[in-house]
Amino acid sequence: MGTRGIYGLRKNKKDKTSYNHYDSYPSCLGEQMFDYIKRHSIEEMNDLYDRLMLVDENKKISELTEEEKNGLEILFSYNDKNELIDEDMYSLLRNFQGDLEKYDRYHTVNIMCDSKDFIKNSLFCEYGYIINLDTNELEVFEGFQKKPQKTNRYGCECNRGYYPCKIIKKIKIDDIHNSDKTLEQYLEKYY
């Protein structure tokens, strides 16, 4: 089983986050998110947040609105569009998991599977990386939480003996832009 996690952006206290099925540990997905921040300005990250529309991962392609379908032609190009009609959004966007850079390469794709509640289940969500555009920080989360954190914005509800993931590190985006450090160096005690 892969190391599952969550990644995405937050603005105006609203998450646009998606599930990542494997390699979510800091040295993989974490470093990818860190590198994404290094290569993008705060304005570019705000633009991405603003253009992303969240969809339910179980929603069928045939159920998409015209607005949601707009720009997805590139995703159909490798397959017969008629064969994909009954596919769900999770399957269609599988190759976008954990890679915000793909939204740059495929600029017309503007949908993301909505996984905002996954971070609340730290038994299964092992790591999380959220670019918080309200505070201009990268927030790094860790799963397997056996104790609640009263200040956790995702609550204190227990699920199978586990609480929501907790923030283990906040790193200013300006510091990331102005430093040669890697995420591993910021998280030295967590590796």
Locations of regions flagged by a protein language model:
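Short, extreme N-terminal segment that most often corresponds to the first beta-strand
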Residues: 1-32
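N-terminal interaction modules that seed assembly of large macromolecular complexes
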Residues: 26-47
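Low-complexity intrinsically disordered segments
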Residues: 41-191
